[in-house]
A protein has these predicted regions:
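Structural core segment of the AMP-binding/adenylate-forming
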Residues: 3, 73-74, 101-172, 298, ...
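Conserved AMP-binding/adenylate-forming core of the ANL superfamily
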Residues: 23-28, 32, 36, 44-89, ...
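Conserved AMP-binding A3 loop
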Residues: 56-58, 193-217
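Conserved pre-ATP/AMP-binding loop-to-beta segment of ANL
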Residues: 43, 154, 176-197, 204, ...
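Conserved ATP/PPi-binding loop(s) of AMP-dependent carboxylate-activating enzymes
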Residues: 349, 353, 365-371, 380-412, ...
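AMP-binding/adenylate-forming catalytic core of the ANL superfamily
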Residues: 113-114, 130-132, 337, 391-396, ...
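Conserved AMP-binding/adenylation subdomain of ANL enzymes
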Residues: 216-233, 241-281, 296
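Gly/Ser/Thr-rich phosphate-binding loop
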Residues: 277-285, 294-355, 373
């Protein structure tokens, strides 16, 4: 199999990644020390931009310390979990680092989640408090109703006029000139600082635990991956309840002493306007977002922007062509990572790039520090030769600490010290890795991991449904769309629209299927599991399905 390969020379004056991070004093892999060393070295440098607000590194340090003081006043201490429910906002940055300084743990959730989804995460994490955006407060409060002990609530910013907030107030509101006294730092590099819930084959999200050193090292790895420069302006449009925005964009900017441009959400119609106005130079994206931008009216494009590089999942040749030739963005870097193993592989910025490849094992700016090791194995755990498809196994110091309160699932994720990704891949003779398919029952839609088991369970609860099976089908935006195969109860009736309406009532909008097909039977294993691997090969399912996206 042949693949397009090319190399782009580094721009004159490019600073080597190790030199970029060596400009600052040691941080000891502590999140707060990472911020503090940058703020002490370059206090007036612009660190964070959010719409019409600009924060210097000194500003971010002060806001973080003030947030830490407010958290201390609420009794937040080592090991406590605090939920954060908001679209992207500067307060999430301050809260994340402040919680880490307290030795506490941020539990971010999607601001679009419904009550049931939020309830599961916050109850499983046993959060002691919730910092919510004003528009998310009601859902957060309903989700936490009945929790013992009852968590406290705080707004991440003052509520707009007319939006009810009851007795809940903003977490912190220290006027200028007030002395900040947040207490002695309690958290260190080995302490868990973030709990990210990711969909799993069980149908219930698993809480992925990461320590501070993981987050900092992932940021250092991102500086190497994208050759982030001191004057970089990193545009963050991906949500801060996922790995990419926190571990790559935010921490990568901090590591390099660069500038993070934070947008509330990805907006395709405003993307080029924002990129042009902010003079952003780098952006991370997902395949669906790139596909949407390619299909937008060209009058939205703003020539003269400063964006030069984009990191994301494997891009096809048309994406490369459009972004390089029409959008004037020469560097598209592909890579692979998971919530459990952030930034595991990538196409080399400073070497040969092979289109649609996952790339090679990631490197650290310091060549003496080894990051990723990778191997491909068969079902028995034996390594296979180059060109042979098997399961992708990864070893890396940037590895989850485990699944929260789930020793069984944690143990099942490893074999002989190697993390089992559940993804099928193969390696070529030159050490580049190529994704084939997912072994797990996970659907990848617009950057979200969606549990097929969760969809099966929720749709199976419809009074007319005997059984349901969710399957991934190719999306014209890249990644997957959702197809639901439905077996109705005898004598019951339901339409495709009925199934979609049920999903809209019980699930987040992104989990609503595009396709619904009614079947006479579902294939099963001897242990009564639906044989989805057989169904994925049945092209007639999609051909017969009702397309609700039309």
């Amino acid at each position: 199999m042949t693949h397009s390969a090319f190399t782009i020379p580094l721009a004159p004056g490019t600073v080597a990644p190790l030199e970029v991070i060596s400009r600052f004093p040691p941080h000891g892999l502590s999140l707060f020390a990472l911020l503090e060393t940058r703020a002490r070295t370059q206090p007036d440098k612009e660190a964070l931009v959010y719409q019409n607000q600009s924060f210097s590194y000194a500003d971010v340090l002060r806001e973080t310390l003030a947030t830490a003081q407010a958290l201390a006043a609420r009794g937040v201490g080592r090991g406590d979990r605090v939920g954060v429910m908001s679209v992207n906002h500067p307060s999430t940055v301050f809260s994340f680092i402040a919680l880490a300084r307290r030795g506490a743990i941020m539990v971010p959730v999607n601001a679009d989640y419904g009550v049931a989804e939020v309830r599961y995460v916050f109850a499983n994490a046993a959060v002691c408090g919730v910092i919510a955006a004003p528009e998310a407060l009601a859902v957060a409060q309903e989700a936490c109703a009945g929790m013992v002990p009852a968590p406290w609530f705080a707004l991440n910013r003052p509520a707009p006029a007319g939006l009810p907030q009851g007795e809940v107030r903003a977490l912190r509101a220290l006027p200028n000139g007030v002395t900040v006294n947040p207490g002695v730092p309690a958290g260190g590099p080995g302490d868990t600082c973030i709990l990210i819930y990711t969909s799993g084959t069980t149908g219930f999200p698993k809480g992925v635990m990461h320590g501070q050193q993981n987050v900092v090292m992932a940021g250092e790895g991102f500086v190497q991956r994208m050759f982030i420069q001191p004057d970089e302006r990193i545009l963050c449009v991906l949500p801060m309840f996922h790995i990419n925005a926190i571990f790559y964009s935010l921490t990568g900017a901090l590591v390099a002493g660069a500038t993070l441009i934070l947008e509330p959400r990805f907006s395709a119609s405003k993307f080029w306007e924002v990129a042009h106005a902010t003079r952003a130079t780098e952006v991370n994206t997902i395949a669906a977002a790139a596909g949407i931008l390619m299909r937008r009216p060209r009058d939205e494009y703003r020539p003269g922007h400063a964006l030069r590089q984009m990191f994301g999942a494997p891009f096809d040749e048309e994406t490369y062509r459009v972004f390089r030739d029409e959008f004037d963005m020469p560097h598209l870097i592909e890579g692979f990572g998971m919530s459990e193993i952030p930034g595991a592989l990538n196409n080399p910025f400073d070497g040969e790039r092979r289109m649609r490849s996952m790339g090679k094992p990631s490197r650290h700016p310091d060549p003496a520090l080894k990051l990723t090791e990778v191997k491909i194995t068969d079902d028995d755990g034996n390594a296979v030769a180059a060109g042979v498809t098997g399961e992708l196994n990864v070893k890396t110091p940037i590895l989850m600490q485990g699944y929260y309160k789930d020793a069984e699932q944690t143990g099942a994720a490893f074999r002989d010290g190697w993390f089992l990704t559940g993804d099928l891949a193969w390696a070529d003779a030159d050490g580049y890795y190529w994704f084939v398919a997912r072994k797990k029952d996970i659907i990848r839609k617009r950057g979200e991991n969606i549990s097929g088991a969760e969809l099966d369970r929720v749709i199976g609860n419809h009074p007319a449904v005997l059984e349901a099976a969710a399957l991934p089908v190719p999306s014209d935006l890249g990644e997957d769309d959702i197809l639901i195969a439905v077996l109705l109860r005898e004598g019951k009736q339901a339409s495709a629209q009925d199934i979609a309406n049920w999903c809209r009532t019980h699930l987040t909008p992104i989990k609503v299927p595009r396709y619904v097909v009614f079947v006479d039977r579902l294939p099963h294993t001897p242990t009564h599991r639906v044989e989805k691997f057989k169904m994925r090969k049945d092209a007639t399912l999609l051909a017969r399905a009702v397309d609700l996206g039309r």
